[in-house]
Amino acid sequence: MSGALKRKRSDEVAWSRRRPVKKPVRRAPPPRAGPSVRRGLPSLQIQTLVAAGDTMITVPSGGICSLIGTYARGSGEGERHTNETLTYKVALDYHFVATAAACKYSSIGIGVCWLVYDAQPTGTAPTVQDIFPHPATLSAFPYTWKVGREVCHRFVVKRRWCFTMETNGRIGSDTPPSNVAWPPCKKDIYFHKFCTGLGVKTEWKNVTDGKDGAIKKGGFYIVIAPGNVEFTCHGQCRLYFKSVGNQ
């Protein structure tokens, strides 16, 4: 009887009155940015620049500099709808073919391709010498060029690639003798590059064209230099961009 009426200790009473601790409920992580999440976001616009036939590009010694962010004002897929554009990606698919004059000699040339951002455009297209000042004795060695010290605040190299071309002293119309096989060489090559994360912002003047004079800030150029093997360029340059800012 005395055992049944035994009083509980005070610490046992306090322990029995404690509320059970609830474990925190784990919430599922937010869904990743898949197709269902991205469905509401506007897709990137695409502009394609074609170099073929009459628009074929000839790359002489010393190189060329050409505007690729050429977004005219309009409502089309490859046109800007506002006064600002953001270029995110660039895909280059070019076929380089050594000229007949270059094929007459046996040589190896290392060419370079740059994507250059112009922070302070002047209304006219910059030349290769404006961006990469160099003496005439280095015209055949573009891999040694650097952005000029006086214009380094204006021109920013976003991407840079080197490529190699070769000639063996024979042009395409030459026919080898029946008992001789000419080894192949890289007198024509496929040049493919796809770059992302560019983030090139361009502000446009209140005009409708997309040329150099229409750019207020942020020109986007491609520079190609052939080394000592001049060539022609055929193919496409595709730009992925968005129209942002005010109408």
UniProtKB/Swiss-Prot annotation:
GO cellular component: host cell; host cell nucleus; T=1 icosahedral viral capsid
Annotated stretches, region: Disordered: 1-39
Keyword DNA-binding: yes
One annotated GO biological process: viral penetration into host nucleus
GO molecular function annotation: DNA binding; structural molecule activity
Extent of motif Bipartite nuclear localization signal: 1-28
Residue spans of biased composition, Basic residues class: 16-26
Cellular localisation: Virion; Host nucleus
Keywords noted in UniProt: Capsid protein, DNA-binding, Host nucleus, T=1 icosahedral capsid protein, Viral penetration into host nucleus, Virion, Virus entry into host cell
Pfam families: Gemini_coat (PF00844)
Bilayer-spanning residue ranges: none
Quaternary structure and interacting proteins, as annotated: Homomultimer. Interacts with the movement protein. Binds to single-stranded and double-stranded viral DNA.
Function: Encapsidates the viral genome into characteristic twinned ('geminate') particles. Binds the genomic viral ssDNA and shuttles it into and out of the cell nucleus. Plays a role in protection of the genome from degradation, virus acquisition and transmission by insect vectors, infectivity, and systemic movement. The CP of monopartite geminiviruses is absolutely essential for virus movement.
Similarity comment: Belongs to the geminiviridae capsid protein family.
Name of the protein in its database record: Capsid protein
Naturally occurring in which organism (per UniProt): Panicum streak virus (isolate Kenya) (PanSV)
